[in-house]
Design a protein with these regions (language model features):
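Extracellularly exposed regions in secreted/surface proteins, prominently low-complexity, repeat-rich
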Residues: 249-252, 258-295
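Secretory targeting and sorting signals
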Residues: 1-34
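Cell wall/extracellular polymer interaction/catalysis modules
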Residues: 30-253, 275, 290-295
Length: 295
């Protein structure tokens, strides 16, 4: 399957009827399976995630009583973004897997090896500016640093993480993977990634592990380059390592519970991610539980 470009975003309509009728459930590791129970305790929740605030931003303070009623303190400008010489939480073995020319790294950190909860932060490589930014010390290129974006809550596989993913194990794969293709039921929000707008093919029905509806989960999708051909549509069924090693591992819209192996974010954050990722910066995702990433 050839790489889709901006001029070919409507090519999904030219797919054969058989390809369109192929259920998204058979292509993605996030297939519905109502026989498993997760740990969220929020069955049926439409989102289930709380957006994190950008690093360094203070929460709103309480009102102060006065003659004229409640008074808010004067607004303060947001502090300068914090820069890092090294990507936080990644050990030497993990850092060695990162491409030298990657300028965008999405770090997905699981709370535990068997946990379905994780935190997502997008880091972008920038020139270090010691005068205007706080920079944490560490080893690395003295002329470059990593700027952290907002911290987002996410779900991953129901049973946590694994270094050797197999079809149906309900765990998300640990490793560093490219982010080279996107798509979804919703129209292209303006991403620079190749976007496959295929409403019928990205339709999903049924319930998740906690009984929550899965409808809308594939409104926005970014394919994670695990066991797939780089640069193709997320719907590409080819599995270079074989079907037994699973596939269809995506970043997609959260449905309020654990996934079958994908990583899910709120729809707002998925849209923000799509608008930020730039293929010219060779974006990658590094994902796994915190202990595995720290090695």
């Amino acid at each position: 399957m050839r790489v889709r470009t901006r001029t070919g975003r409507r090519a999904a309509g030219a797919l054969t009827a058989a390809a369109l009728l192929l259920s998204a459930l058979s292509l993605t590791g996030c297939e519905a399976d109502g026989g498993h129970r997760g740990s969220s305790g929020r069955p049926g929740a439409p989102d289930g995630l709380t957006d994190g605030a950008p690093s360094g931003r203070e929460p709103a303070s309480a009102h102060h009583p006065g003659r004229g009623g409640p008074v808010r303190p004067a607004a303060r400008p947001d502090p300068a973004p914090e820069l890092f010489r090294e990507l936080p939480g990644l050990g030497p073995r993990t850092r060695e897997e990162l491409p030298d020319d990657s300028g965008q790294v999405l770090v997905v950190t699981g709370t535990g090896h068997d946990s379905s909860r994780s935190t997502v932060v997008l880091y972008e490589r920038v020139a270090a500016d010691k005068k205007n930014h706080r920079t944490r010390s560490g080893t690395g290129d003295a002329g470059a640093a990593w700027r952290a974006g907002a911290s987002w809550m996410a779900h991953n596989g129901l049973r946590g993480w694994t270094e050797r993913h197999h079809q149906g194990d309900l765990r998300s794969p640990i490793g560093v993977f490219g982010l080279t293709g996107s798509g979804g039921r919703r129209k292209d929000p303006g991403t620079l990634l190749p976007y496959d707008h295929a409403p019928r093919a990205f339709t999903i029905h049924g319930s998740g592990s906690e009984g929550e509806p899965l409808s809308g989960s594939f409104g926005y999708v970014v394919a994670i380059d695990y066991n797939r051909r780089s640069g193709t549509s997320p719907l590409d069924p080819v599995r270079p390592m074989g079907g037994h090693r699973g596939g269809g591992i995506w970043l997609h819209v959260d449905h309020g519970g654990p996934t079958q192996g994908c990583v899910s974010l709120s729809r707002k954050n998925m849209k923000s991610l799509l608008l930020t990722l730039d293929p010219r910066r060779r974006p990658v995702v590094v994902m796994g539980d915190s202990a595995s990433l720290a090695r």
